Curated annotation (Swiss-Prot):
Belongs to the diol/glycerol dehydratase large subunit family. Its EC number is 4.2.1.30. GO terms for biological process: glycerol metabolic process. It comes from Citrobacter freundii. The lineage of its organism: Bacteria, Pseudomonadati, Pseudomonadota, Gammaproteobacteria, Enterobacterales. Its cofactor is adenosylcob(III)alamin. This is Glycerol dehydratase large subunit. Keywords: Cobalamin, Cobalt, Glycerol metabolism, Lyase. It catalyses: glycerol = 3-hydroxypropanal + H2O. GO terms for molecular function: cobalamin binding; glycerol dehydratase activity. Pfam families: Dehydratase_LU.
Length: 555
């Protein structure tokens, strides 16, 4: 067949490199409204749920039992379930119905009922609802700070830059598992150099991650995963109860804690039980609520390639963020793994959360070039900073970031690199050369960094852990090296571990180390003139884009 020239051009477009698949309900490859999803139902006897979404208590699997016993407001359940799904959907977008009124209903309905509510809503209505249902009034952002070589100097410099760019949380992980303590240490020092009060985590194997937190090298955890079918749980030798125990281990030691889930995970692992991705995710969100965990990272997360490949998949991602907020949970709304070759698709996917605002719009944005992102690449990376800042300016939307100058960025990267150099020297760790400090000051990514002696580093990591190095040792090393401000910031982060105030729902810290959470900054949106509004000071910051032609400069 003779080819159309237009179709030849279209075939070369980036979007046509994306993988898309038709709906296959039997294998769970359907975003919402699978013919195999259960109809919603609930029955309460003697204060106990004895029927849930078409199953009697005798038929419950362990997830049903956990949800029925711990996650639903039982006294209100039968009354709330009598409301029509369309009526609840309309309440979600009605500015005359408060968030508080809706929470009383949405914490008392079942996972299947939530699906029926979401089925009534288009993405604009979901965004309207999310703007109202977000737990914390003020939106914010989280980033990834990693690199291919696990270079601690580069991590410190990138973390400092991410701090001045406005990220409230920063997350790292490793290429080599044994590097975790160095990465956590570098992230802590760099982030507190960039901005006081940034929360940090190192996503690794749970025992190591918990130990790093207990030593004061990290301040939160989020990669404790939960799933929507029993088979996926047991495949990992887990149950909702074991996950709840792990969550309490973090929180009881003063570490902020959220779970992670996301549409598509069960289908990806081959245990979907023919249910839709959103129904199974709804169960995950209820598990989170039942475990007493304050928040959830969801939005397909690392399974976005699966969810984004099926029809209405990106709509389902927005719906799962909304469902989590309807359970009065903190929402870290993903946008954290690349899923499309198309700049148009990846931007549209992000606008679903950026426009209404979530507790963390990204979880996280890659603060490094994606070739250095050890979480498999983010939807936006360091090369998109200017685009993102101009989007905020174009739309007058607070996406949690701020423009920075080249001069201040170079200065803060240099300070962070010198600070981590001093810490390594004071703690007797492998020396960081002036060449490394200079390279990190000006680097874009690991391609611009000299190699370190990995064998020597890993031996030092092991020795550091045997010596029981803690956050207080870091404070002492910085103080004795003249970095009093960073030392003070880290000491204040350690104090937060004692007070525990930042364990509140949706908590972040401002630059004075005051907690900003759903307790003291509760979202009170009820239409125009209410809820979060960009202040004059913040708007001036957003507008301050480098290269803007100022009227006074025109001759």
């Amino acid at each position: 067949m003779r080819r159309s020239k237009r179709f030849e051009v279209l075939a070369q477009r980036p979007v046509n490199q994306d993988g898309l698949i038709g709906e296959w309900p039997e294998e769970g490859l359907i975003a919402m409204e699978s013919p195999y999803d259960p109809a919603s139902s609930v029955k309460v006897e003697n204060g106990r749920i004895v029927e849930l979404d078409g199953k009697s208590r005798a038929e419950f699997d362990m997830i049903d039992r956990f949800i029925a016993d711990y996650a639903i407001n039982v006294p209100e359940a039968e009354r709330a379930m009598q409301l029509d799904a369309l009526e609840i959907a309309r309440m979600l977008v009605d500015i005359h119905v408060s968030r508080e009124e809706i929470i009383a209903i949405t914490t008392a309905i079942t996972p299947a009922k939530r699906l029926e509510v979401m089925a009534q809503m288009n993405v604009v209505e979901m965004m309207m609802a999310l703007q109202k249902m977000r737990a914390r009034r003020t939106p914010s952002n989280q980033c990834h700070v990693t690199n291919l070589k696990d270079n601690p100097v580069q991590i410190a410099a990138d973390a400092a830059e991410a701090g001045i760019r406005g990220f409230s949380e920063q997350e790292t992980t490793v290429g080599i598992a044994r590097y975790a303590p160095f990465n956590a240490l570098a992230l802590l020092v760099g982030s507190q150099c960039g901005a006081p009060g940034v929360l940090t985590q190192c996503s690794v194997e749970e025992a190591t991650e918990l130990e790093l937190g207990m030593r004061g090298l990290t301040s939160y955890a989020e990669t404790v995963s939960v799933y929507g079918t029993e088979s996926v749980f047991t495949d990992g030798d887990d149950t909702p109860w074991s996950k709840a125990f792990l969550a309490s281990a973090y929180a009881s030691r003063g570490l902020k804690m959220r779970y992670t889930s996301g549409t598509g995970s069960e289908a990806l692992m081959g245990y979907s039980e023919s249910k839709s991705m959103l129904y199974l995710e709804s169960r995950c969100i209820f598990i989170t609520k039942g475990a007493g965990v304050q928040g959830l990272q969801n939005g397909a997360v690392s399974c976005i390639g699966m969810t984004g490949a099926v029809p209405s998949g990106i709509r389902a991602v927005l719906a799962e963020n909304l469902i989590a907020s309807m359970l009065d949970l903190e929402v870290a709304s993903a946008n954290d793994q690349t899923f499309s070759h198309s700049d148009i698709r990846r931007t549209a996917r992000t606008l679903m959360q950026m426009l209404p605002g979530t507790d963390f719009i990204f979880s996280g944005y890659s603060a490094v070039p994606n070739y250095d992102n050890m979480f498999a690449g983010s939807n936006f990376d360091a090369e998109d900073f200017d685009d993102y800042n101009i989007l905020q300016r174009d739309l007058m939307v607070d996406g949690g970031l701020r423009p920075v100058t080249e001069e201040e960025t170079i200065a803060i990267r240099n300070k962070a690199a010198r600070a981590i150099q001093a810490v390594f020297r004071e703690l007797g760790l492998p020396l960081i050369s002036d060449e490394e400090v200079d390279a990190a000051t000006y680097a874009h990514g690991s391609k611009d960094m000299p190699a370190r002696n990995v064998v020597e580093d890993l031996a030092a990591v092991e020795e550091m852990m045997k010596r029981n190095i803690t956050g207080l040792d870091i404070v002492g090393a910085l103080s004795s090296s003249g970095f009093e401000d960073i030392a003070s910031n880290i000491l204040n982060m350690l104090r937060q571990r004692v007070t525990g105030d930042y364990l509140q729902t949706s908590a972040i810290l401002d630059r004075q180390f005051d907690v900003v959470s759903a307790v003291n900054d509760i979202n009170d949106y009820q239409g125009p003139g209410t809820g979060y509004r960009i202040s004059a000071e913040r708007w001036a910051e957003i507008k301050n884009i480098a290269g803007v032609v100022q009227p006074g400069s025109i001759e």
